Amino acid sequence: MRPALFLCALLMPVALLGGCRQQGDWQHLEGVALDTGYHITLNGDLQAAERDLLMAAIQGELASLETESETLRGLLLAGWPTRDAAQLPFLASLLEALRGAEQARAVDRLDAVLAEFGIDHAMVELGGVVRTRGQAGRRPWRLALDRSGLDDAPAPPLRLRDAALVTREQPGDAVMPDGGGERLLAVSVVADTAEQADRRARELLLAGPSAADMEQAIRLVVLRPQGIDIQYGTALEPLLER
């Protein structure tokens, strides 16, 4: 059994930090964790007691993740000559990447909690990281891709089922590199889990657009001398709502 379920009784008061709304057969759970908000939409016939138990399990899982995060950050900062990350750009960037990875891990672990409660249709979002379970009614979940520095032109939404979506952006302003060339501004990745999508997105940001395998379920936002170019991987095309 997962630690969150053991902590349910102890952490029931913590559930008050979150919220729950119901619209027909849909339940909406929300709260704050890991420096951001989370939103869970699920389709399940939950009674009030079951809903409270689920909220307690979610808060227990998030409390465990917060503890793990604090421990890891403490160990990381202890190895540096100063704890002022603002004076160390590399450390600040590392901590930001760590937080993104933690948020992706949290989404996967919340999805696992929903699975333990027998919930087959749900969507979890935390810090912009999304994972879907089953469908939204009779259709896959419908998600909007992050604009990531683009203009106001509409982008085709995604239809996802049992998959995760992560979008990561390059830090800094959208400027051309010295000598021209191209720069990858942002990448969106669809994968089976949020951690897989997050890891792949960060690998692509480091490697650049020329190293991308365009047969995968990815979207690249590339800055070129001629302007911004949007590239969709072939595995992503069937998921786009045209």
Where do the protein language model's features map onto the residues?
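Mature catalytic core of soluble alpha/beta enzymes
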Residues: 2-242
